[in-house]
């Protein structure tokens, strides 16, 4: 009997990484992991460290597309994206990324390139290795842990969130999510109504419920994310009340006003949703998933209707806590 295989794809996107990550999510519906050599060293993953640092990466550039698949060394291995799949996506994914590069060049009038590697492993190897590597993490008051790790006896139930990162769209391990959780931890949300835009795994929606919101609406344009949110609500034994909603779609389907809105997205989507957040927000807006290079362009738009109460940064990621200006309806 043939042993089942598992495929790992490694990418480096020198420019507009968040656009490429959104494309990968929309194309594959698989979770992405942002990593670096430092992270791999922390998990003592010697095999992967050797693979990414010693292999010849393949390369595609819009300024010379005829040289596709040229093997080169990336300029650095500070940040790369890992995508894992039970299927070999090489024949479809890499050409799709190349076409996406060329479309970006045409629409943004700029050159784009990316580096990539792929390898296949026995399924039993990566599953166990991944479980051993994914450890619980504390984000302010919240203790985030996978289902295969029990919560510590001293942790309060209301502070624990169970998320399986291998199966989810987001977890507390990413800087953008952890900063959202930290900002939520400091807020008194009892008897408030909340909106989670781009709910993904549902981790922020679960945190909002644990913070005491009286009514929650969550939405995502990916049907798999909606399913994941509902699954994780059940995993955490959080009932959806009559006034709670999990919606497949964007904010255009949502009516009313919300005391707090949380949106952990990407900068381009955040900028496009400004008028919607003005329409829906009564008081506090938390934005995350913004790369430092895009922060000024986001602030230029949001200064019109919101005041910046707090700004946090972790590595290249930025999160904002905003207050809606009373003069804006």
Curated annotation (Swiss-Prot):
Q: Which family does it belong to?
A: Belongs to the methyltransferase superfamily. PrmA family.
Q: Which GO terms describe its molecular function?
A: protein-lysine N-methyltransferase activity
Sites where the protein binds S-adenosyl-L-methionine: 177, 198, 220, 264
GO CC terms, sorted: cytoplasm
Q: What is its EC number?
A: 2.1.1.-
| Matches recorded under Pfam families | PrmA (PF06325)
Its recorded name reads Ribosomal protein L11 methyltransferase
Instruction: Quote the catalytic activity from the record.
Output: L-lysyl-[protein] + 3 S-adenosyl-L-methionine = N(6),N(6),N(6)-trimethyl-L-lysyl-[protein] + 3 S-adenosyl-L-homocysteine + 3 H(+)
Where is this protein localized, as stated in its record?
Cytoplasm
Principal location: cytoplasm
């Amino acid at each position: 009997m043939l042993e089942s295989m598992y495929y790992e794809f490694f990418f480096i996107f020198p420019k507009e990484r968040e656009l490429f990550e959104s494309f990968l999510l929309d194309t594959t519906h698989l979770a992405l992991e942002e990593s670096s050599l430092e992270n791999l060293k922390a998990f003592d993953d010697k095999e992967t460290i050797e693979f990414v640092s010693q292999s010849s990466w393949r390369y595609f550039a819009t300024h010379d597309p005829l040289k596709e698949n040229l093997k080169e060394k990336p300029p650095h291995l500070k940040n790369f994206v890992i995508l894992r799949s039970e299927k070999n996506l090489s024949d479809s994914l890499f050409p799709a990324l190349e076409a996406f590069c060329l479309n970006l060049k045409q629409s943004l009038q700029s050159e784009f390139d990316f580096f990539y590697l792929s390898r296949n492993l026995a399924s039993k190897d990566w599953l166990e290795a991944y479980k051993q590597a994914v450890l619980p993490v504390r984000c302010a008051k919240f203790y985030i842990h996978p289902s295969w790790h029990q919560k510590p006896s001293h942790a309060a139930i209301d502070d624990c969130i169970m998320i399986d990162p291998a199966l989810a769209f987001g977890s507390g391990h990413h800087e953008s999510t952890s900063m959202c959780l930290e900002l939520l931890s400091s807020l008194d949300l009892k008897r408030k109504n909340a909106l989670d835009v781009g709910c993904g795994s549902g981790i922020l929606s679960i945190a909002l419920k644990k913070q005491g919101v009286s009514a929650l609406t969550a939405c995502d344009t990916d049907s798999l994310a909606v399913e994941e949110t509902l699954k994780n609500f059940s995993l955490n034994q959080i009932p959806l009340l009559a006034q709670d909603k999990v919606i497949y779609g964007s904010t255009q389907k949502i009516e009313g006003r919300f005391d707090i809105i949380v949106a952990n997205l990407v900068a381009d989507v955040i900028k496009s949703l400004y008028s919607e957040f003005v329409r829906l927000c009564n008081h506090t807006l938390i934005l995350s998933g913004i790369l430092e290079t895009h922060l000024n362009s986001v602030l230029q738009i949001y200064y019109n209707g919101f005041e910046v109460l707090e700004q946090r940064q972790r590595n290249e990621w930025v999160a904002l806590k905003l207050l809606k200006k009373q003069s804006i309806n």
